[in-house]
């Protein structure tokens, strides 16, 4: 399994967003990671679909859209229409996670699931083989520049070494 680098544009300088996207285009990065926050699921608000649309026009790499929002399933059509390849939703935001994962797949995107630092990896047992990837948050979601939570590395190692029927 080859690691995929997916730089987030969350910390980009929006006055120079096109330059930052160009830098990612010319890099070894595999994807462009876009964090969308609603101020409800997480305590901060980032950018919304107009910025996603702008990034989609400029990016030459697949878009990895990470929705830190309540009811992400409502936005599957918009995320798909704006060109996302991967749609990433939080385990904690989806009471019907299996349904949401299936809807993402049916829309033609790769479903991904994110867990917050305090969420046990075991919570993904029933869904792990239905998702393209798992994102383990190494900070509490909602703000950039936080201190890395070291115990999240154990979660990554556990996921990496767990047997999967897809391997």
Labelled PLM ranges:
Residues 1-77, 81-82, 94, 124-130, ...:
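Conserved N-terminal beta1-alpha1 strand-loop-helix module at the mouth
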Residues 85-156:
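Conserved anion-binding
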């Amino acid at each position: 399994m080859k690691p995929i680098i997916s730089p987030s544009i969350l910390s980009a300088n929006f006055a120079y967003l096109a330059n930052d996207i160009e830098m990612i285009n010319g890099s070894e990065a595999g994807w462009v990671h876009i964090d969308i926050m609603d101020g409800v699921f997480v305590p901060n608000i980032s950018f919304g679909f107009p910025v996603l649309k702008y990034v989609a026009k400029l990016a030459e790499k697949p878009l990895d859209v990470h929705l830190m929002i309540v009811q992400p399933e409502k936005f599957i059509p918009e995320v798909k229409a704006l060109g996302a390849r991967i749609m990433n939703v939080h385990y904690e935001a989806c009471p019907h996670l299996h349904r949401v994962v299936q809807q993402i797949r049916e829309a033609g995107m790769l479903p991904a699931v994110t867990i917050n630092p305090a969420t046990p990896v075991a919570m993904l047992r029933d869904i792990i083989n239905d998702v393209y990837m798992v994102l383990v948050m190494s900070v509490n979601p909602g703000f950039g520049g936080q201190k890395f939570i070291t115990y999240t590395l154990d979660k990554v190692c556990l996921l990496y070494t767990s047997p999967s029927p897809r391997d």
